[in-house]
Amino acid sequence: MRLSGRGLRCVRGGREVFDGLDFEAAGGEALALIGRNGAGKTSLLRLIAGLLMPAAGSIDFDGSEPDTPVAEQAHYLGHRDALKPSLSVVENLAFWRDFLGGEPTDLMAGITAVGLSHAAELPAAYLSAGQRRRLSIARLLVVRRPIWLLDEPTSALDVRGQAMFARLMSDHLASGGLIVAATHSPLGITTREMRIGAAA
């Protein structure tokens, strides 16, 4: 299983973010994107996720479902938590499972894995920033996708939350999944670094 990009060019708002960018990540590997703010780390994640279209180049995934678009085999966890404040923890997770086309699953297993079982019926509006982040992470668990695209994934997580997420990432990699992450903080797992843009 291998995810790759060749000759990628990204233009946003009339400004060229990067050009001629190549990358590659294999199953079981975590690729950490590093670079100054504005270098294009988030833009690359959004290109892979299908949220932006490249001005040039291509992205390919040699996985178990070659006819399925890359975007449909990837989870994108942005730096903002996409939650409905009026819905409970379990209702938010059910929404994302259904939205992403997942099979009926035990939502409580995902909720327990991120340490929110005590708050399962609590509206998201009442969650702390760290709890909201944990709930967002639970989305990765209820629908199985081999590619995790993570943008500052440990933001708002305390030390225990970071350790919890490191375990989940390790489990994902051990099962053959791959991770591409943009982060300024250590992820707590072994990564291969890729610099985007000129050194600061």
Curated annotation (Swiss-Prot):
ABC transporter domain boundaries: 1-200
Q: What is its main location?
A: membrane
According to the record's subunit comment, the protein's assembly and interactions are: The complex is composed of two ATP-binding proteins (CcmA) and two transmembrane proteins (CcmB).
Q: Which PANTHER family match?
A: ABC TRANSPORTER I FAMILY MEMBER 1
Top-rank taxon of the source lineage equals: Bacteria
UniProt name for this protein: Cytochrome c biogenesis ATP-binding export protein CcmA
Q: Please describe what this protein does.
A: Part of the ABC transporter complex CcmAB involved in the biogenesis of c-type cytochromes; once thought to export heme, this seems not to be the case, but its exact role is uncertain. Responsible for energy coupling to the transport system.
Q: Which Pfam families match?
A: ABC_tran
Q: Which reaction does it catalyse?
A: heme b(in) + ATP + H2O = heme b(out) + ADP + phosphate + H(+)
Record carries keyword Cell inner membrane: yes
**What is stated as this protein's family in its record?**
Belongs to the ABC transporter superfamily. CcmA exporter (TC 3.A.1.107) family.
